Amino acid sequence: MSGGKFARRRKRKPLPLRFLALLLLNVALVVLAVVFAVKLHHVTNLLITQSAAEVWKGQSEENFVQVSAFQPVGKELTESQIETFHQTLEQKFVDASLETPENGSLYQDAWSTTAQDITVSTNSVTYTAKTIGVGGDFFLFHPLPLRSGSYISNRDFTYDRVVLDEELSWALFGSYDVAGQTVWISNEPYVVAGVVSREKDKASSKAYTDGAGMFVTYSALTHITGGEEAKEPGISCYELVMAEPITGYGLSVLRESFPTKDKSVFDQNTNRYSLKN
């Protein structure tokens, strides 16, 4: 008989220990790289809403700080209280011998309400959206990625413009490219200014709640929920970027002069999140 067909098979040699060690090391490095990428993405999302001081500072040689005031349930602010605080803040700058730059400002702020269920519709679809009333330069502090269009702000001439998140835009129109389209709220037309992606970090998810969302100006929300004769929607979050001549100045101004200083929870956001931590 030919020995080729029935030849004894060679025994396969076991893999060298060195090769196995290198293989395990490569697997471990891949796992670590994936974990780091996830963490980096998470931190980047956090930094988006914590970097207003750096954005506002620009090329200025002044130091700026970002601080926030959060209101407990039942102790929300009104816009008139914020306007009063503006006057106090400007006097604080005078007392500290801080000069307002030409064509500039020593501070910028924003405020927002807790999300409310508001019914919004098109000619064919009706949806209940988590709606947040915003004031000041809200999207300086929350520069959500635009899928289309633009943001809204207090500088708008009218309050009948809204920003949809991508989930609501898809539910209403089946598209994200809907800037300029019309939606109806309480039988009144509102123009879609833009469509944004929502923040993904845990803190933002808790603040904005789950589900399709919409941003309207604080004035619009006041109108939608009953007009000027009704109680104003409560402002639950106030955010401020301001000049800080010495460390801790911004937070101390809030603690000393904010309208609800005995009830608010204050936080300094600048440098709060860092890859070094």
What are these regions (language model features)?
Residues I82, I132, R161-V162:
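Solvent-exposed, acidic/flexible segments
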Residues P72-T78, V120, P245-S252:
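Short, surface-exposed beta-strand/loop "edge" segments at domain boundaries and coil↔beta transitions
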Residues E62, T126, V134, D156-Y159, ...:
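Extracytoplasmic
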Residues M1-L47, N277:
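Gram-positive cell-envelope targeting signals
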Residues L106-Y151, D156:
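The feature marks short, hydrophobic/small-residue-biased sequence motifs that occur predominantly
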Residues K39-T114:
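Membrane-proximal extracellular/periplasmic loop immediately following the first transmembrane helix
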Residues D137-L146, L164-K276:
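Mid-to-C-terminal secondary-structure elements
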Residues E61-A69, Y107-W111, R161, G211-F215, ...:
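Hydrophobic beta-strand segments of well-ordered beta-sheets in folded domains
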